[in-house]
Each structure stands twice: as structure tokens, then as C-alpha cells.
Regions:
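Hot-dog-fold acyl-thioester-processing enzymes
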Residues: 1-81, 153-155, 165-247
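HotDog/MaoC-like acyl-thioester-processing domains
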Residues: 1-3, 81, 85-190, 257-300
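Catalytic-pocket segment enriched in acidic/His residues
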Residues: 225-228, 232-267, 272-274, 283-286
């Protein structure tokens, strides 16, 4: 990335209009295995907690993206963290939002195994009014990590132990998973992941990175094949939380990834109440390794 590109990255994109559609809400809910009736209601369905990650479907072209004018190699782009902060109720079908995206900062770090990682803090804000200057209804923050291609002649990654993202996200404080104290509120195992699951989520969310469904493209990055979209399990975890929290609004939902999930992984979702208004969710692969950890704060 050149210095000119880095400077351009801090120019906010043009705002765009997002009309929340009930068909898209139900599609997203089905793609993320939502057990919540309000997500599939015949009238005025409520958006799932991570639904606004689908905002890219409403972008007309590159001028609406915080990445406008910047080249990205999707073979080497990883998702490190994601956070949603809600300052009001979740949008329902028919809500008209004004959306604006910007890159807040970029910085570099050296990986433990060498090579440079470029971290990008991408912020997407949503307003219910036509303006985009006041406090937003929702703020979505993403940490994206660009890594260097593997060295020439390096063997392709394998699905065991499938730790490809760990080095990349070390700089966002990946820690060993320790069971959180508190009340266990759910413990579920989802069916084994398939590439069809990845494609369904990509269609529902607008994340069309071919690394999640195109074998040749995935292998060109050094991976053995397609792997799960990180936000898929994050959305499933959020839906599990919503089913438990009921009508209590969530103020903040934050996710941090540790390892890739692969086709064939039957992920386990364990939610623990860590305080009067706080939860932690650990999502683990069949071998017990952590795929992601999520934290949520409710308003009551």
C-alpha cells in the first residue's frame, strides 16, 4: 500500500441510502440459523443483531465504500475484530437509514513469523435521518488485517490445526480461552458447516470474497480450500444470545476471532452470563480450539 493510498483511505465515503427490507431480514435470519420468531415475523420483522453487516448490498458502487480507490487482495485479507454499538432500538422492516463509511486509521505490525501486517479500522455509521452529522443510531467497527503472501515454495496450509488467522490477529490481543465464571445460559452444537452455508451467508450479507466458496482462489492464497466467513458464526452466536435475552436491548456486541472454521466443523456455542447485564460467548471447533469469542452488554 503506498503512502498516497494510506492518505486517501482517511477520506470518508459518500453516504448512501439503505431501506431495510423484510425479505432480506428473513433471508439473513435463515442464513444464520436464527431461532428467534421476531426475525421471521410475517409483518415488521426485527433485524437480527448483526444484520447491518449486510449494508454493502445497498452500496451503488465504490464511492460508497471506505475502501474507495484502494486495492485489496482478498486472498490475504482477514477479519480480526467486529463491534456493533446500538444507541437505539434495532431497525425493523421499512426503516430508512443513511449510511456512511470511513477508514479511521491504518497501522502496521510485524508478525511473529516475520512479514508485515496492515491493520485497517473501518467504521460504518447508520442514521435514521437524512443527515449524517449527529449521533448515529448504530456504529459498526471492523478491524481488517492485510497479510503478506506466503513465501515462494511454502506448503499450502492444512485444516489441522487450522490456525491461519492467529498470527494475524495477535496484535488485537488474542488470548487463550478460559471459561468465564457465571451462569451458563446456552450450550448448543450446530450442524457441521458446509460450503453451502458459506454461500447462503454471503448472499444474505453481501460478503462475496471468493475465498469462502472458490477452491482455486482459496488455494491460491495458500489455504487448502474454502473456509467459513467469520461473521457467519458471529451472527449465529448473536442470534443465540437474542433468544436468551428476549426483549432486553443489546447496547454493544463485540467479536474477536482466533482460528479459521472449516467445512465439516460442527461448532459449539456456549453462552455465559458474566454480570447483571453482560454475556460472553465462546464458539469452539470440534477439537476444542476457539473459533471466536463474543461479548455483549445489554441495557437492563
Amino acid at each position: 500500500m503506498t503512502s498516497g493510498e494510506a492518505a486517501k483511505a482517511f477520506t470518508p465515503a459518500e453516504p448512501f441510502r439503505m431501506v431495510v427490507e423484510e425479505g432480506k431480514i428473513r433471508e439473513f435470519a435463515r442464513a444464520t440459523a436464527s431461532p428467534c420468531a421476531e426475525h421471521l415475523a410475517s409483518e415488521n420483522p426485527v433485524t437480527p443483531l448483526t444484520f447491518l453487516a449486510s449494508h454493502r448490498l445497498w452500496m451503488i458502487d465504490d464511492r460508497h465504500s471506505g475502501w474507495h480507490g484502494i486495492h485489496r487482495d482478498f486472498r490475504y485479507l482477514l477479519h480480526g475484530q467486529e463491534e456493533f454499538t446500538f444507541h437505539g432500538p434495532l431497525p425493523v422492516s421499512g426503516t430508512v437509514l443513511t449510511v456512511r463509511q470511513s477508514i479511521e486509521r491504518q497501522y502496521e505490525k510485524r508478525g511473529r513469523r516475520g512479514g508485515t501486517m496492515v491493520f485497517t479500522d473501518l467504521v460504518t455509521r447508520f442514521w435514521t435521518e437524512s443527515g449524517n452529522e449527529g449521533p448515529p443510531l448504530v456504529e459498526e467497527r471492523s478491524v481488517l488485517i492485510s497479510t503478506e503472501p506466503p513465501a515462494a515454495g511454502a506448503p499450502a496450509g492444512t485444516s489441522e490445526p487450522a490456525r491461519a488467522p492467529v498470527e494475524a490477529v495477535e496484535a488485537v490481543e488474542v488470548v487463550q480461552v478460559v471459561a468465564a465464571p457465571g451462569e451458563l445460559v446456552f450450550d448448543t452444537v450446530q450442524p457441521a458447516l458446509t460450503i453451502t452455508d458459506f454461500v447462503k451467508y454471503q448472499g444474505a450479507s453481501g460478503d462475496f470474497n471468493p475465498i469462502h466458496h472458490d477452491t482455486a482462489f482459496a488455494q491460491s492464497s495458500g489455504k487448502p480450500g474454502p473456509f467459513a466467513v467469520g461473521m457467519l458464526a458471529a451472527a449465529v452466536a448473536a442470534n443465540q444470545l437474542t433468544a436468551v435475552a428476549g426483549d432486553v436491548p443489546v447496547h454493544r456486541y463485540r467479536v474477536r476471532w482466533s482460528e479459521i472454521a472449516w467445512p465439516g466443523d460442527a461448532l459449539r456455542y456456549q453462552g455465559v452470563r458474566t454480570g447483571a447485564t453482560s454475556y460472553r460467548i465462546d464458539v469452539t471447533r470440534p477439537d476444542g480450539r476457539n473459533h471466536l469469542t463474543a461479548w455483549a452488554d445489554t441495557t437492563g
